[in-house]
Amino acid sequence: MRDITRPEVWAPDADMVEVVVDGTGTIMARSDGGWWWSEPLPPGTLYQFRIDGGMLLPDPRSLSQPDGPHGPSRIVDPALFDRPATFSADLRGAVGYELHIGTFTPEGTFEAATTHLDHLVDLGVQAVEVMPVADFPGEQGWGYDGVGQYAVHAAYGGPEGFVAFIDACHARGLGVILDVVHNHQGPEGNYLAQFGPYFTSAHHTPWGDAINLDQPGSNEVRDFLLGACRQWLVKYQVDGLRLDAVHEFQDDSPRHYLAELSDEVRAWERETGRELTLFAESDRNQPTTVSPIGSVPGALGMDGQWADDVHHALHSFFTGERDGYYIDFGTADVLKQALTKVFIHEGGFSTFRGQDWGAPVDPASGLYDGHSFVVSLQNHDQVGNRAVGDRISHSTPLGCQAAAAALYLLSPFTPLLFMGEEWAASTPFPFFSHLGPELGPLVTEGRAREFERMGWDAEIPDPQSPATRESAALRWDEVTEPDHARMLAWYQELLRLRRDRPDLASGSLAEVSMEVLDEDTVLMRRGTTTVAATRARDRLVEIPVEGEVLVAWGEYGPVPGGHAVTGPGSLVIDTKAD
């Protein structure tokens, strides 16, 4: 593992590189492969690089940027990472909880977030998924415009705060998954191209030139990304990574970058004696993403992948929305397919995309199971990319959220909650960022135009306004209010059932079945547990399933051959108690 006190940088085309401390530059020594290095610096030292007499630049591998991506880098004391490993867990199938450090609390810091970890334990969460903490411009933002892939955002608490947060999670039995964005760099503070061929025009992405994974110089670029992953997993002792939008990795090399990462992570597991988990966000609906390396052509070896079709099926069914990418969703039959087959688009035509899409999941292959697919009812994308960042509870009865939650939390998949979902938080999660005076207004104007084209007539919150970020900060004082407390208790009961009942802990896709009772109501059967969920409004729905009602949302009672519940709502029934 590299010496983090010794400045070193890859600048293959440079004639001279200096390390600059307190305004004084010292010429660095050149080694093979275009690398430059200097003698170690004391912890706390602020330094920058200067290439061929040009501008001062931050260290691309800096662990700390106290003044943001435009400022100097800081040497972090290696002793920060000298601590024993106390936690290890396979996070496939674990109940995850996605949170954004900047809005999980009003303070927006790791330290403040730690004060609410016991709430997550009581809820039944087993792992927190932290939205990106890699350094990005400004004080607050979602983090997907990060530019310091090794540095922890200073406003959150920097590397010291992150280590303390991870240790606090582990002390409570919570795993930590970190969201990393390696498919692009943000537009502000991105100095990588001044050091070497980190980008290539051979491929194009929504953000411009692609990260260079397969052109000249790509070996060092791949090592740069792998090194960041190793830092989080080995040095910081994060337990898993969520890899953002892997479908945007443009890599035509014989060995795909993700396959290389998978192999490296397996080696790090052997080195550390800890289980490490890779989750990939992908919209390609390809089971090869989670197929073991070498098992089938194109296998990438990820441990899990996001399955957005399940979200779309739940959201569209319970809200009635059918616009945009929801156009192929919304019916009970589609919901049935999503909860049993994972993908709605499994090789057939996607109306939204205008082409055939995806491939079927084959449970009989033995290459993966339900725990290989991460599902959610809400997440940062599906809430935050709405015009005003509204949650499902803001536009539908609470019973609809409760019924949808019962289906996905008790499904054979890996469930992921979004912060505040468990009590139907009143706060929205709109998009916000804190870019400079040149880029900030462009983002604001572009976002307004985007939603105008989509037909939204609501006033779009200004992403650059501090008030937009403040509106997203969770209100922890509302948790005890009646409706919020009722939803929280519902989520706690569902997660208790998932933990305590073997039928529900299993990831077997072969042992889940769905039945459509009517256009508003479905049954999900898993062993001796049946989940009834209905979106019916203010009417009694008969559920022809006998047994003991374990938990219920909505007024219910016995009827011949089963039970009846007033919708929207849900019953979870133990059929072995018949």
Segments (PLM) and residue ranges:
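Substrate-binding/active-site clefts of carbohydrate-active enzymes
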Residues: 87-91, 100-271, 277, 289
